[in-house]
């Protein structure tokens, strides 16, 4: 049997391969392989748009809730420390966003220097994970509506044949695409408000505002409590600002973002990470992440290996915040001593190099 050259693959096969990818970046990289692949894989609007129902149910018919996918990537330069990378985030092209957009990795805000571009032929690109956010638009004008408060969304989609779950407005919705329907149905018996959902070991879990984990039954469209609430003591803090779910070393963990309020300004002062001890059947605090780092971004929470990123501190948690001038800043919380360092500190600039993007073209 003769060996077939990559450039001689049938157009039908290349088109089928491109349709299997959910990331616009992957499609662009396929087209950049060679001239024949570029001509075979058309960059149509349908292919660039998100391959799932983009609109979510709303109580106000005058607005549209648009589900927008974003993707985290690790970027490396062959000419400079190929084992070290930078963290970037992109928003896929869709009906609302005509082009792939570069975003700040933690806040998800668009990088304002619109003239900058990323040449995929000059860098190494590896996908880390996808995340999803909700954008609110005027139902008549299809224009984005500015919001006074943040709307958080997390979204799980395995394939076109598996039910998809969306967390929106502290409630959980499901869409069973294999039945040919694209309508959203609210999960039954939701007695609590929820702050995050996650796909773990083939099952979908949610965490409520009290730190208890619930299992979502997609066959029955119901939710069942699996664990008790985490033993969080607030005597040092005013509140738990946010609660997330994350996988760490195969375990399902809960991350609490703790804050205090002074002069009507809320400020993050620390984090607590818990995992369930199956033998003791109770929550235990995770005091060390080893060589890993936790990234707490808008709409997403995940771990990375610190040594694979420029300046990344191991056993730490990176997160973003907005100062009194509404300007975004990045901070890092160190689990070993509980200290917090911010990006504006000149002496600590090196530990934030993973978020700088020296490879962008002007």
UniProtKB/Swiss-Prot annotation:
| PANTHER family named in the record | F-BOX PROTEIN (PTHR47123:SF25), F-BOX PROTEIN SKIP23 (PTHR47123)
The domain of life for this entry's organism is: Eukaryota
Q: Which residues form the F-box domain?
A: 4-52
Q: What's the protein name?
A: Putative F-box protein At3g25750
* Matches recorded under SMART domains: FBOX (SM00256)
